[in-house]
Regions:
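Active-site loop ensemble at the mouth of alpha/beta enzyme cores that anchors a bound cofactor
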Residues: 61-86, 90-94
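Short, acidic Gly/Pro/Ser/Thr-rich loop/turn segments
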Residues: 32-34, 66, 163, 204
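Conserved active-site and cofactor/substrate-binding residues in soluble primary-metabolism enzymes
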Residues: 30, 34, 54, 93, ...
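A short secondary-structure junction signal
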Residues: 23, 34-39, 70-72, 111, ...
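Conserved active-site beta-strand-loop modules that form the wall/rim of enzyme catalytic pockets
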Residues: 23, 56, 68, 89-91, ...
């Protein structure tokens, strides 16, 4: 087995974050100024940016963030984390059986995708907003940002069976405060923002390292005879 693998089987283009590298540095509060000065002096063209810019670049690269895009049911196959964060040849770690079983036998029930949101809509969806295919819930938006070049976009966990070319919509809660012809300020009204997918994890549910034939198929046939 290779050390790592990706869930891009059958996709026409490479993962947008395949060559993206980023990291977080934790420093004492009283050392922040010195660290920033060293960073700016370390090379030409460096500049400071805020957390929203960081989020925009992360979402553009299709990289999930712990505690934002990951819930208690998530497995690394759904997030394409087998590409960078899971070693396939090391054993004896919590969750190893689930990782191996899903890689060899199963298909991850959900898949991470980038959503390009309708730029004409005013409000952005909140993280946790429902993604719909027609009237059916197809998944949930996990991170949402307004990118400086690409406009509104999001990461979303979708059901694996959602077609890659499906027209989706994300629910947006808009406040009625200040709206005309309303007798009182009621609860927020749910509207929808159209969304187009950029597929990160193949709907086929197979990784590059997945076996061509399900393991044990021959044994099963011999038992039947």
């Amino acid at each position: 087995l290779p050390i790592c693998t990706s869930y891009d089987v059958g996709l026409a283009r490479a993962h947008p974050g395949a060559s993206w590298r980023a990291g977080l540095v934790i420093v004492p509060v009283d050392a922040v100024g010195e660290v920033v000065d060293d960073f700016l002096a370390d090379g030409p063209g460096r500049a400071l940016a805020g957390s929203l810019a960081w989020e925009a670049l992360r979402i553009e690269a299709g990289r999930p963030r712990w505690a934002r895009d990951v819930d208690e049911r998530a497995i690394p196959h759904e997030l394409d984390w087998l590409r960078t964060a899971v070693h396939l040849t090391k054993g004896c770690y919590p969750g190893q059986e689930t990782v191996a079983r899903t890689l060899n036998l199963g298909k991850p029930p959900r898949r991470l995708a980038i959503l390009q949101l309708d730029g004409l809509a005013g409000a952005l969806p909140e993280p946790g907003a429902v993604v719909r295919l027609g009237e059916r819930a197809a998944g949930v938006a996990t991170s949402v940002v307004r990118h400086h070049d690409l406009g509104p976009m999001a990461l979303a966990l979708l059901r694996r069976g959602v077609p890659a070319d499906a027209a989706l919509a994300v629910e947006v809660a808009e406040s009625t405060e200040g709206a005309e012809n309303t007798e009182s300020d009621g609860p927020a009204v749910l509207t929808r923002v159209d969304a187009a997918q950029e597929v990160l994890v193949s709907p086929e549910g197979r990784a590059q390292a997945s076996p061509a034939e399900r393991p044990g198929a021959g044994l099963r046939k011999s038992l039947l005879h």
